[in-house]
Amino acid sequence: MSREYSENVLVQNSAGNLLQNVLGWEVVLAYNSEKLGPDGTLGRTSYGEVLLTRYFRQALLRLNPWLTPNQLDEVQKKFTAHVSTASLMQINEEKYFLLRDGIPVTVKRPDGRTEIRSAAVIDFKNPENNHFLAVKEMKIHSQLYRRRTDIVGFVNGIPLLFIELKKPTVDVQNAYIDNYRDYLDTIPQLFYYNAFLMLSNGLEAKVGTLGSKYEFFHEWKRLKESDAGSVELETMLRGICEKKTFLDLLENFILYDYSGGCTTKILARNHQYLGVNEAVSAYENRKLKDGRLGVFWHTQGSGKSYSMVFLAQKIRRKFVGSPTIVVLTDRDELNRQISDTFENCGLLGKTKASQFIASSGTDLVKKLRGNPSFVFTLIQKFNLPKEPPIYPDHDILILSDEAHRSQYGIFADNMMHLLPTASRIGFTGTPLLADDHITERTFGGYLSVYDFKRAVEDGATVPLYYENRADTVSYTHLRAH
């Protein structure tokens, strides 16, 4: 069968058409037609190059018009350099923070002194101010190997998206085993900058990150929470590759978790992304909600702790004044777990989580009267009902874990007395009871729901079955004893 009519190419063409005609990406077919050279198809001088420097340098000048030619070269050199002994994950992590936060460049001031400025690589505020390019059938060579990828997606010349496709009759896992793992070994430079890995046969699609085992790749089934859900590639492309969403995921929904003695790259799951953005929207409109932003009900095992981290990360990045975020639990073990998660995911900088944990009611008040980035506390430490209220000149956001527990009652009242201007979101893994007026009074109604039934359908958690069994005991045996 000719290439033009093979089933996997039909899947590839459908994906390319959607990216181009619906999502607004430029799409180029490089199969046997790419011309090398600065003025060639992609501006590459060799098949070993994965960073498209033509588009990269154009974007740098567009986003940073103050760059001189020498500074432009300096920025490119810093972005492409890496330690030869670094692992692929270490290189990927380093590149990620440069493309997210900007590349430091030395600038000479009029008085002759120098200062460090940050050169933006991507315009996260204005998606249309970036160049989105998808290249089909792109040749990539290393010293020993030659490969050709199905689709690679570039933003400003940076290869952020990898898509491996199979025909509909082939299991998606084959794309992981036969192709992706091979590319990791043979053309690792392709993944230095990668943010998203997609595997699909058209009818089913999975997305993951560098370093993930196949079982941790997940579906992207919905564009909004109310959708029934579809596992097809079209839904994933619409849900991830829409330009604004793509940049939102890139900037705010990727973590590097350092727990367990190794680095794990985390991408928000579909339900986390949708739920967290509902919470962000509620926070944006906090002045209209009298502090009660709502209850975030995502069933047990669906990644609630990471959702809290994603929410904190986005709010502190996107809102002027960066609020103090107070994380509440009701048990010491939970308090340590959630604070460790924030630390291991880098949200606390280089400061240990213990420095942000309130040791007593008095220490809690002392911390809150300052301007800390985070406070972790037990709800029981709101135990000073006569303490004067705090009216800070900055916002305070309270994230309460397992907000429905009954013992929150009196302490929740103390909390609202002490922090009358704070906004509050309650996180829970179980539905609220119909007569739970305390939680509603404290946090409001549901702002995001991801229940057990949907989580099981999505594979985000597993069902627990109870089987009522008893051993059979003979009556004769009982009489004998």
Question: Which positions does each model-derived feature cover?
Answer:
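Conserved RecA-like ASCE ATPase "motif II neighborhood" in helicase/translocase motors
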Residues: 374-399, 406-413
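Conserved coupling/interface region of RecA-like P-loop/ASCE motor cores
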Residues: 453-475
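Conserved small/polar residues in nucleotide/adenosyl-binding loops
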Residues: 476-481
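Conserved RecA-like helicase motor-core motifs
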Residues: 346-361
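Conserved nucleotide-binding/hydrolysis micro-motifs of P-loop NTPases
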Residues: 168-170, 203-206, 332-334, 381-383, ...
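Conserved motor-coupling elements within RecA-like helicase/translocase cores
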Residues: 362-374
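ATP-dependent helicase/translocase motor core
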Residues: 2-324, 333-348, 371-374, 380, ...
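Post-DEXD/H (motif II) to motif III coupling segment of the RecA-like Helicase ATP-binding lobe
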Residues: 409-461
